A protein has these predicted regions:
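Active-site histidine-anchored catalytic micro-motif
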Residues: 109-183, 192, 288
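Active-site environment of divalent metal-dependent phosphoester hydrolases
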Residues: 154, 203-205, 301-303
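Short, structured patches in soluble enzyme cores that scaffold and shape functional sites
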Residues: 146-149, 173, 194, 199-202, ...
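Short, glycine/polar-rich helix-capping loops at beta-to-alpha or helix-loop-helix junctions
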Residues: 203-213
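A general structural motif
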Residues: 176, 196-204, 232-234, 274-279
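Short gly/pro-enriched beta-turn/loop segments at secondary-structure junctions
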Residues: 189-193, 214, 243-245
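Catalytic cores of soluble, metal-dependent hydrolases
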Residues: 2-34, 40-115, 123-127, 134-137, ...
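Internal, active-site/partner-interface "lid" segment
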Residues: 182-189, 194-200
Length: 326
């Protein structure tokens, strides 16, 4: 098809990568150096480690327009009282999540996709809330794809540790303290019917009850991946998250991956996704083209090996944003 208009200076929304065209994204990196949700220190350096691993340059090499929005202001644990023993630093974490949510909304209002770097997983109560709020203002809703070794479905009442990084998914589905669950004044942010949890292999007894109470059924354990394969699990999960929604928020906890490939995480669990399974999951996300916001959390360079986990995080981000083998 020809067009008489002069398009010599136009920017195409697609780039050619191999046999398929991939959309070009305007991406804003948002760092959240939060570690108060975890008991093991060091994950606050995760955003820097992922940046040092070349995230911005690698995404730009794929043709994306990338800007770095810097870091969200986060309180330092050593200067704060931990407060409630059933939810350590809850007040400070809730404030950080609110700031993160507002930054995500602003990013999306400016036509960019948020790429949030953690930090511990408690920040996701903010990032996913921001994405949900952006679409709520448009009369739409989103789903969520949650890659994690853990369910993150505790509340202060069910938690055995009081670590808030074990609570964000429950908060997004309306369970738990208002400071996490009711950012922007309402809950839930995500419907259970549009939520998919992938790769879980360590669930507390209280979380099982919370999952039943919330009506969450799309929980894919590592056994499901072993028996059915990553593609079948991903296709079903994306159908769940995409049903009647404008797309989905993707939350990637690096402990979802087996610690042989991702050693630099605070709560490693043996038997996770392999290197190639993780890449395949990200590649399928890119193929579907419905990802609306993305985050990588729980990279802990203090316990990493030569920045291997941060390097892998960058590789997986590239796959999620369209990098192909051929």
């Amino acid at each position: 098809m020809t067009n008489s208009a002069d398009t010599s200076n136009a920017v195409s929304p697609f780039q050619q990568t191999g046999a398929q065209e991939q959309p070009i994204h305007r991406i804003r990196i948002i760092g959240v150096p939060l570690d108060m949700g975890a008991s093991r220190r060091g994950v606050d350096m995760g955003p820097s480690a992922v940046r040092v691993a070349g995230l911005e340059a690698r995404l730009e090499a794929l043709g994306h327009e990338v800007t770095d929005g810097g870091n969200i202001r986060v309180e330092i644990a050593e200067t704060q009282a931990s407060g409630n023993e059933k939810a350590h630093y809850l007040e400070q974490i809730a404030e950080t999540c609110k700031r993160t949510a507002e930054a995500v909304v602003k990013t999306m209002e400016e036509g960019m996709m948020p790429l949030v770097l953690g930090g511990d997983h408690s920040l996701a109560a903010g990032s996913a809330s921001g994405a949900a709020e952006f679409y709520r203002r448009r009369g739409e809703k989103i789903g969520v794809i949650w890659f994690d070794a853990h369910a993150d479905f505790n509340t202060p009442e069910s938690s055995l540790s009081g670590n808030v990084h074990g609570m964000p998914l429950a908060a997004l589905l309306g369970l738990g303290p208002d400071g996490l669950a009711k950012i922007f004044g309402y809950a839930p942010k995500i419907a259970a019917a549009n939520t998919a949890l992938i790769g879980v292999r360590d669930i507390d007894a209280g979380e099982r009850e919370n999952i039943r109470r919330a009506g969450l059924t799309a929980v894919y354990t590592m056994r499901d991946i072993d028996e059915r394969g990553m593609r079948a699990v991903m296709e079903e999960a994306l159908s769940v998250a995409g049903r009647g929604t404008a797309g989905y928020h993707v939350s990637l906890d690096m402990d979802w991956i087996d610690p042989e490939d991702a050693p630099g995480v605070g709560t490693p669990v043996r038997g996770g996704a392999t290197y190639r399974e993780a890449h395949l999951a990200m590649e399928i996300l890119a193929d579907h083209g419905q990802m609306r916001s993305f985050e990588i959390v729980e990279v802990n360079p203090v316990i990493d090996e030569h920045n291997r986990t941060a390097d892998l995080a960058v590789e997986l981000a590239c796959s999620a944003f369209g990098k192909k083998i051929l």
